[in-house]
């Protein structure tokens, strides 16, 4: 009995040490960002309510599903394939009209040469209209290949958000110190011209969003990108 308890103690200490070694400190560049959360401000059920993200407000989370032969969720382990369409609005500072955001899964229209993982044939695409955004504002997100064995791995995502002359890249990366034993997407980091400027963490009940400071010209684009990922019903997290 003493031997068994001793062995259990050794195993427990080994697991604790392993967890401690895997947990990561927050990147130092996050010190130059503002940490925010999407706050419900009323107007409906959770996920379909009015919200605020700092100075950015709107209504979001209107997600619908329908059966489809080819869809964003092209899992071989699922008999029913679905296509998710998400709509939300964002009122930018100084604007009276809201930006209308429409996102949907569909056939790949983005060809990112910098993506290194083996990707699915489908992408997640968002369009942004009105509310003071430049014409052609859009976001494309590519997903890693799916399948029975792939479902056991960490999902990989990569995308580009175009906001006038600002092009932001988004890549899956853990951005906080919490250790989560989950195969889901843990977070995204946003970069411009190779410099990390913002992020969103998917860990925990409240997703943490890191935006450039208020005087940074990348703040609005980063907020729109973060909200697009916040409302994305990622198949890797289902």
Predicted regions and their residues:
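Bacterial N-terminal signal peptides that target proteins for export
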Residues: 1-11
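Bacterial N-terminal signal peptides
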Residues: 10-18
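Short linear Ser/Thr-Pro motifs
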Residues: 18-24
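Intrinsically disordered, low-complexity proline/glycine-rich segments
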Residues: 25-238
